[in-house]
Swiss-Prot record:
This is Uridylate kinase. InterPro entries: AceGlu_kinase-like_sf, Asp/Glu/Uridylate_kinase, Uridylate_kinase, Uridylate_kinase_bac. ATP binds at K9, L10, S11, G12, G52, R56, T159, Y165, D168. UMP binds at G51, D71, C132, G133, N134, P135, F136, F137, T138, T139. The keyword Kinase applies. GO terms for cellular component: cytoplasm. One of its GO terms (molecular function) is ATP binding. The gene is pyrH. Inhibited by UTP. It comes from Prochlorococcus marinus (strain MIT 9313).
Length: 237
């Protein structure tokens, strides 16, 4: 395997499947089965999950909610997704722990960096919920932060598109996909991959990001093996 320790970022929207809201159990089980295959080969894997399938703080703020309050609601939505992922993973035979940045001891462990690393060393998947515990920060930024904290080799951003494009491929059929690019290219070009804080964190800590299509069967395993899928972002192309 090309990577020993991986941080997998899943958007909340990815868990919806073809639905317009909520969680598609079939998608959760498909992700769990792919993760199980990777973990069985010895890769240590942590997950950060978003909450946009249930609530998105920016939309709440745009509708008149206080931004910080809306972000806290979004953080709670990520915990719902994290617990759902834990259930799917454990049904797939993967021992899993949920750690949350907002303490809720009845359903999850509090986020403790050293404990998270110990879980990974024991072959458990750790799902991080609750964002980073502070408003005004995205779950993409949380993914970069947790990756740096647990000394991950790479961040996988598994999404609905098969990589990074020079413009929106849904609106522009002639959009060009990048096989590889630098963090500086992403920041300078304002490419819609992750927010600038998330990109800068990975840049400063020299953690590459691989963006790929979550819904292509086996892609998580291919990415862990270092196969050339999606787009790779790093300090040097």
């Amino acid at each position: 395997m090309a990577y020993a320790r991986v941080l997998l970022k899943l958007s909340g929207e990815a868990l919806m499947g073809d639905q317009s809201y909520g969680i598609d159990p079939a998608i959760v089980q498909s992700i769990a089965e792919d993760v199980a295959k990777v973990v069985a080969k010895g890769t240590q894997l942590a997950i950060v999950v978003g909450g946009g399938n249930i609530f998105r703080g920016l939309k709440g703020s745009a509708a008149g909610m206080d931004r910080a309050t809306a972000d806290y609601v979004g953080m709670l939505a990520t915990v719902m997704n994290a617990i759902t992922l834990q259930d799917g993973l454990e049904r797939a035979g993967v021992p899993t722990r949920v750690q949350t940045a907002i303490e809720m001891q009845e359903v999850a462990e509090p986020y403790i960096r050293r404990r998270a690393i110990r879980h990974l060393e024991k072959g458990r998947v750790v799902v991080f919920g609750g964002g980073c515990g502070n408003p005004f920060f995205t779950t993409d930024t949380t993914a970069s932060l947790r990756a740096a904290e647990i000394n991950a080799d790479v961040v996988f951003k598994a999404t609905k598109v098969d990589g990074v494009y020079d413009r929106d491929p849904k609106r522009f059929p002639d959009a060009t996909r990048y096989d590889s690019l630098t963090f500086q290219q992403v920041l300078s070009g304002e490419l819609a991959v992750m927010d600038s804080t998330a990109i800068a964190l990975c840049k400063d800590n020299n953690i590459p990001i691989v963006v790929f299509d979550l819904f292509e069967p086996g892609n998580i395993g291919k990415a862990v093996a270092g196969e050339a899928i999606g787009s790779r972002i790093s300090n040097a192309t």
